[in-house]
């Protein structure tokens, strides 16, 4: 809906496997930035600056991350925002699907929240699959600039039309209903995380950092 031939999309790595292919299928060019363990597998402002060109259309951010479990802090997002402030042609796609799965007192932040000047340049993606354990129901949603949402609606309506009506009704109940189960669900994820991290770090030749969110460990 927004990419023309040759437009570039910046994708911090490690990333969810489909990100680059989605760009290629839309005739765009993925610009992958390797983010190592020393930065917590997170994009640094100086690396973002170096990779922005006149053809850059989007920056993709996923926090908490699939597959690393890394989370951007408020300060880290603000630092990225200061770079983007200088490049008004670049939009941000914020994949917030794991926003409610966080551990150890970490607080979820999204870039449009901490950088209000990016509000009109941010497309937020979310869904019910992760936090509400509704993977098979196939319900997602987006919020962003009106012109982009309208363009997305045109593509969506000719692609898959809509999800099943029962899925939409169930999603309304999930979003509006009792949210206390999320905390207990996260406690189960936390126990599994700690067990996996402990065993990996005790295994010769393997190591991993402790993820702040999501339900992945990257070793």
Predicted regions and their residues:
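Phosphate-binding glycine-rich loop
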Residues: 1-8
């Amino acid at each position: 809906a927004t990419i023309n031939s040759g437009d570039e999309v910046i994708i911090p790595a490690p990333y969810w496997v489909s990100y680059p292919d989605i760009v290629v299928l839309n005739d765009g060019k993925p610009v992958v930035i390797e983010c190592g363990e020393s930065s917590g597998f997170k994009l640094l402002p100086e690396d973002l600056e170096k990779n922005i060109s006149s053809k850059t259309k989007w920056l993709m951010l996923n926090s908490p991350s699939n597959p690393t479990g890394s989370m951007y802090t408020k300060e880290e997002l603000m630092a990225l925002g200061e770079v983007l402030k200088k490049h008004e042609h670049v939009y941000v796609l914020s994949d917030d699907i794991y926003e409610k799965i966080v551990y150890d007192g970490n607080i979820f932040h999204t870039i449009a929240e901490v950088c209000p000047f990016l509000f009109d340049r941010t497309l937020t993606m979310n869904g019910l699959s992760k936090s509400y354990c509704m993977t098979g129901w196939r319900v997602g949603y987006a919020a962003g600039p009106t012109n982009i949402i309208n363009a997305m609606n045109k593509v969506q309506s000719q692609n898959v039309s809509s999800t099943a009506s029962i899925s939409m009704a169930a999603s309304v109940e999930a979003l509006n209903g009792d949210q206390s189960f999320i905390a207990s669900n996260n406690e189960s994820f936390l126990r599994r995380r700690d067990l996996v991290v402990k065993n990996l770090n005790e295994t010769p030749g393997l190591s991993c950092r402790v993820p702040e969110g999501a339900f992945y460990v990257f070793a």
